[in-house]
């Protein structure tokens, strides 16, 4: 396996609270891993560690074979995109300026390259070109979320971290964003880690699903394997909940087509 990310026996403590303990898992390059678990189980902590925002209390995390503790943030961050719920955009910047912010840091002297990159990512996330000069306050929730995703992708990172990025939008927009994200993953081959509270979303999007609980990995498997063979009571509860709803296999998402996403 060509490994993109590896956690080795990680422990993380906040004050007197142990959030992660004996936490082990690895992600292959190009994998789309959805992460699910109860509130406070350490899902966001995992993403923040990969991005260098916080450090483990003990042991090591490897990104592309290198221990992140041996890297400074300027080395680590260009390879990692980060999108969160609500997509915190710069209110005084236009859509184009928001998306190009990271590109401008990398390509300070190549404005034409930056403009081409902005157009490329706007198109890929379903944003109309005419929105370039608008400010965040003039956009719908779905459009703002797309800008946030485009900004996270603008530097062409190898890894995309997403922390409940669709939590603040309506169900129709959420479904459209799910389809777009699957298409982006398919086109770019980027490694994605996607945190969600929704088991249905985790099963639809992920090529693999990481179930967290009590600071440890409860199960790490392909969606179909998770449904067929839940191995703990916690995972069984999640699976039973999903069986009471309608499970949409991720193949359906890849084949779906729709239009007008950039206008919603």
Which stretches of residues belong to each language-model region?
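Conserved ABC ATPase signature
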Residues: 135-139, 143
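Conserved ABC ATPase "signature" C-loop
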Residues: 214-215
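Short helical segment in ABC ATPase nucleotide-binding domains corresponding to the A-loop/adjacent helical element
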Residues: 95-105, 112-115, 119
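Helix-to-loop junction immediately C-terminal to a conserved catalytic motif
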Residues: 51
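ABC ATPase "signature
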Residues: 220-221, 229
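ABC ATPase NBD coupling module
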Residues: 67-81, 105, 111, 229-230
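Conserved ABC ATPase "signature" region
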Residues: 112-130, 183
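A short, proline-enriched helix->beta-strand linker immediately N-terminal to the Walker B motif
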Residues: 154-158
